């Protein structure tokens, strides 16, 4: 619900929402966003960020929806966001929990947890795209919030970079799926790996494309295990003449 007496212009720049709310005594303002909702492997990561009063000065003008930026740019902005943040948190929801509750419920749960883990309860919460209740304070859903509200954009960066780092770490355990490349999202290469090896513990078994490969025959299981061992042993080895 839009707060009474607060005029928020979408053309006021990335910091327009925070400035308007703080002027009306509704600060500090937390932005919340997630990463990994559309993936079929790996966790969902939800972040909450409260920018400090000098956030506008300390943050690069490149701050925008993390999905529009390169991985290298996001990594640099991640450090900038943490320096500019008065408070922040990140919540990691594993694939098993997503399978139990569904990704939408997991997303809402993650948003509530992220706000609850902030050091101080915010005066207002801005969410990206859809309304969420249960923060213990007022909130507002902002359409395309990660492109128009700085605190949501900052949360998007924290969530995306945190999840990318997790997926790169998982790649060292499951090299055959190439998680470092596609980060658990559906690609032709990922689909081919699923068909060949079946899902691993980090795949979301409730997803249709994963479930299709979730119950291989005993013979196929044996072959896929051999493939995994071979892929792991050859990872990083370059054939020479």
From Swiss-Prot:
The organism of origin for this protein: Frankia alni (strain DSM 45986 / CECT 9034 / ACN14a)
Reaction equations catalysed: Endonucleolytic cleavage to 5'-phosphomonoester
Lineage per the UniProt record: Bacteria, Bacillati, Actinomycetota, Actinomycetes, Frankiales
Matching InterPro entries: RNase_HII, RNase_HII/HIII, RNase_HII/HIII_dom, RNaseH-like_sf, RNaseH_sf
Cofactor annotation: Mn(2+); Mg(2+)
GO BP: any one term: mismatch repair
Keywords assigned: Cytoplasm, Endonuclease, Hydrolase, Manganese, Metal-binding, Nuclease
Cofactor note as given: Manganese or magnesium. Binds 1 divalent metal ion per monomer in the absence of substrate. May bind a second metal ion after substrate binding.
GO cellular component assignments: cytoplasm; ribonuclease H2 complex
Localization annotation: Cytoplasm
Binding of a divalent metal cation, residues: 33-34, 128
Enzyme class: hydrolase
Positions of the RNase H type-2 domain: 27-227
Family matches, as CDD domains: RNase_HII_bacteria_HII_like
Pfam families in UniProt: RNase_HII
Family: Belongs to the RNase HII family.
Domain of life: Bacteria
Entry EC number(s): 3.1.26.4
Function: Endonuclease that specifically degrades the RNA of RNA-DNA hybrids.
Primary location group: cytoplasm
Gene that specifies this protein: rnhB
Coiled-coil ranges (or none): none
Name under which the protein is recorded: Ribonuclease HII
GO molecular function: manganese ion binding; RNA binding; RNA-DNA hybrid ribonuclease activity
């Amino acid at each position: 619900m839009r707060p009474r007496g607060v005029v928020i212009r979408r053309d006021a720049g990335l910091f327009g929402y925070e400035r308007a709310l703080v002027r009306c005594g509704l600060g500090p303002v937390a932005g919340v966003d997630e990463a990994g909702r559309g993936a079929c492997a790996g966790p969902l990561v939800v972040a909450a960020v409260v920018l400090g009063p000098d956030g506008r000065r300390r943050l690069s003008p490149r701050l925008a929806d993390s999905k529009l930026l390169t991985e290298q740019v996001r990594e640099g902005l991640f450090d900038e966001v943490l320096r500019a943040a008065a408070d922040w948190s990140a919540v990691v929801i594993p694939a098993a929990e997503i399978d139990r509750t569904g990704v939408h419920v997991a997303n809402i749960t993650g948003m509530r947890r992220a706000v609850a883990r902030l050091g101080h309860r915010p005066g207002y919460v801005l969410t990206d795209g859809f309304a969420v209740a249960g923060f213990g304070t007022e909130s507002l859903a902002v359409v395309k919030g990660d492109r128009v509200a700085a605190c949501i954009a900052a949360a998007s960066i924290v969530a995306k970079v945190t999840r990318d780092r997790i997926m790169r770490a998982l790649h060292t355990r499951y090299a055959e799926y190439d998680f470092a490349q596609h980060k658990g999202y559906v690609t032709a290469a990922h689909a081919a790996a699923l068909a060949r090896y079946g899902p691993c513990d980090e795949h979301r078994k409730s997803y249709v494309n994963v479930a299709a490969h979730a119950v291989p025959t005993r013979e196929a299981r044996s072959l896929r295990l051999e493939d995994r061992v071979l892929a792991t042993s050859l990872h990083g080895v370059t054939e020479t003449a």
